[in-house]
């Protein structure tokens, strides 16, 4: 198994730049790819990404708009939003050496196909080896070198362990796993549940309500994960419970911020949609196909679709039939 000395990061946003810093701290030679040549040139000359201000780029990070140059790396991190993953992978796929690990660093489910991130990679780049990195991590914390732990999953345990060795450092601790689907479900479900948490905060329903919502939401995440064969230790680990706790903690999460605006009756934050807005209806359909009850996720999907008011959704959740806790 290769030591993955060279690592490319496709996507020069805040999260991509933070992961480039992670790889550099781990002693790897890093290529950070930006599709926009002007953006790449600015980062390269300023040695700072305006999307991650105050964080100087390490000397080991080269910045380029040349995708072929990035594709020569031993492993490639794909750091683009979930709904843009297929396009990014299709562009880089013809340039990759056979078997190159492609690590998805997005959390979500592809709209329209209902495919998880590693499934998208497998379809768009059959020559590559899919993997997934997920867990409780905000870009600015990671870029600053604050202690962070995540999960990195691949079907082959030796590959997952080698990727962990390539990225791990005293400030960034990945745990390896072969439970790819469990990791993906945790990342996708928590986006939707974070919108619900934001709504609770925006409505000023109190800390007790937020705790109840987070706990019952986690029960939904676990039910869906188990229906897809996920392992309990994955769902209760960093990529499941850990990420849910972080994302429900405050407006630094784009999904929580979207829910907060909804709860306050304000327009949704300008710019890109929160990933949970795409994922909510897909998550509900996946749950229905497996006979899994996800009332909180259903409520979020209905609110986003304009099918129910927030107050009516809250009332419906509170008036569900009483039952034993599970």
From Swiss-Prot:
Coiled coil (UniProt feature): none
Catalytic residues (UniProt): 190 (proton acceptor)
Annotated localization: Cytoplasm
GO molecular function ontology, one term from the record: glycerol-3-phosphate dehydrogenase [NAD(P)+] activity
Source taxon at top rank: Bacteria
One GO term of the biological process aspect: glycerol-3-phosphate biosynthetic process
Pfam family, one: NAD_Gly3P_dh_N
Protein transport among keywords: no
Entry EC no(s): 1.1.1.94
PROSITE patterns linked to this entry: NAD_G3PDH
GO cellular component term of the entry, any: cytosol
Associated pathway: Membrane lipid metabolism; glycerophospholipid metabolism
Alphabetized UniProt keyword annotations: Cytoplasm, Lipid biosynthesis, Lipid metabolism, NAD, NADP, Nucleotide-binding, Oxidoreductase, Phospholipid biosynthesis, Phospholipid metabolism
Binding site for sn-glycerol 3-phosphate: 107, 135, 137, 190, 243, 253-255
InterPro entries from the UniProt entry: 6-PGluconate_DH-like_C_sf, 6PGD_dom2, G3P_DH_NAD-dep, G3P_DH_NAD-dep_C, G3P_DH_NAD-dep_N, NAD(P)-bd_dom_sf
Main subcellular localisation: cytoplasm
EC class of the enzyme, as a word: oxidoreductase
Record's catalysed reaction(s): sn-glycerol 3-phosphate + NAD(+) = dihydroxyacetone phosphate + NADH + H(+); sn-glycerol 3-phosphate + NADP(+) = dihydroxyacetone phosphate + NADPH + H(+)
Residues engaged in binding NADPH: 15, 35, 107, 139, 254, 273, 275
Keyword match Oxidoreductase: yes
NCBIfam families: PRK00094.1-2 (NF000940), PRK00094.1-4 (NF000942)
Functional note: Catalyzes the reduction of the glycolytic intermediate dihydroxyacetone phosphate (DHAP) to sn-glycerol 3-phosphate (G3P), the key precursor for phospholipid synthesis.
Protein family: Belongs to the NAD-dependent glycerol-3-phosphate dehydrogenase family.
Protein name: Glycerol-3-phosphate dehydrogenase [NAD(P)+]
Source organism: Bradyrhizobium sp. (strain BTAi1 / ATCC BAA-1182)
């Amino acid at each position: 198994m290769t030591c993955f000395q060279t690592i490319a990061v496709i996507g020069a946003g805040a999260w991509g730049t933070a992961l480039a810093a992670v790889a550099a701290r781990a002693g790897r030679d890093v290529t950070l790819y930006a599709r926009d040549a002007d953006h790449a040139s600015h980062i390269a000359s300023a040695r700072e990404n305006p999307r991650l201000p105050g964080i100087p780029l390490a000397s080991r990070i080269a910045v380029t708009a040349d995708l072929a140059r990035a594709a020569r790396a031993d492993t490639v991190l794909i750091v683009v939003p979930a709904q843009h993953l297929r396009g990014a992978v299709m562009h880089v796929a013809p340039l990759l050496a056979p078997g190159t690990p492609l690590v998805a660093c997005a959390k979500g489910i592809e709209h329209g196909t209902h495919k998880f991130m590693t499934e998208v990679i497998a379809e768009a780049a059959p020559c590559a080896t899919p993997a997934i990195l997920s867990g409780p991590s905000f870009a600015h914390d990671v870029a600053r070198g604050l202690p962070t732990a995540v999960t990195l999953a691949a079907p082959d345990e030796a590959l997952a362990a080698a990727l962990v060795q390539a990225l791990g450092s005293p400030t960034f601790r990945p745990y390896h796993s072969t439970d790819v689907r469990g990791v993906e479900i945790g990342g996708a479900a928590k986006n939707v549940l974070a919108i619900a948490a934001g709504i609770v905060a925006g409505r000023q329903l109190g800390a007790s309500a937020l705790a109840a919502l987070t706990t019952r939401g986690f029960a939904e995440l676990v039910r869906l994960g188990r229906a897809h064969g996920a392992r309990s230790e994955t769902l209760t680990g960093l990529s499941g419970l850990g990420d849910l706790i972080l994302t429900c903690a405050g407006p630094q999460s784009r999904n929580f911020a979207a829910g907060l605006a909804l709860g306050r009756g304000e327009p949704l934050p300008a710019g890109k949609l929160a990933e949970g807005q795409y994922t909510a209806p897909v998550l509900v359909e996946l749950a229905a196909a497996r006979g899994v009850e996800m009332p909180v996720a259903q409520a979020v999907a209905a609110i986003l679709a304009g099918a129910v008011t927030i107050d009516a959704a809250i009332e419906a959740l509170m008036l569900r039939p009483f039952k034993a806790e599970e």
